[in-house]
Amino acid sequence: MKLHELRPAEGSKKAPKRVGRGNGSGLGKTAGKGHKGQNARSGGGVRPGFEGGQMPLYRRLPKRGFTNIFAKEYVEVNVSRLNIFEDGTEVTPEVLKANGVISKVKDGVKILGNGTLEKKLTIKATKFTKGAVEKIESIGGKAEVI
């Protein structure tokens, strides 16, 4: 098989439905829309969520909660991801971004305790979990809140 011999799988491609192009096509005259009525008109049809006049589900369910506009969004990094650094490295949010561990700093970096840490590092972050601090300090590293 060569690249110019590649074909789509049998039955995976359908010819487009050409409506309103003569009665011989089977989709002429009313173009599959029937006679008159809301759905036959241009722009016809009901809005999404309309249930025929019955009180729709999105209005039957109660509103709940709110979005706290002061909520802080931290980028979470597990200690296992920090093994890419050399022993004795000072790891800061800027260093994490430069090495592709995180893409954005947002409101800060939170270090989580999932996985194992094999390198002795000085880690500076906005927040740490208890488990993360234990793992960092158990091998002689430092966890500093910035």
UniProtKB/Swiss-Prot annotation:
One of its GO terms (cellular component) is cytosolic large ribosomal subunit. Residues 1-54 are annotated as: Disordered. One of its GO terms (biological process) is translation. SUPFAM superfamilies: Ribosomal proteins L15p and L18e (SSF52080). Gene3D superfamilies: 3.100.10.10. Disulfide bonds: none annotated. It comes from the Bacteria. The keyword Lipid metabolism does not apply. Coiled coil: none annotated. One of its GO terms (molecular function) is rRNA binding. Residues 21-31, 42-52 have a biased composition (Gly residues). InterPro entries: Ribosomal_uL15 (IPR030878), Ribosomal_uL15/eL18 (IPR021131), Ribosomal_uL15/eL18_sf (IPR036227), Ribosomal_uL15_bac-type (IPR005749), Ribosomal_uL15_CS (IPR001196). Binds to the 23S rRNA. Belongs to the universal ribosomal protein uL15 family. Part of the 50S ribosomal subunit. This is Large ribosomal subunit protein uL15. The gene is rplO.
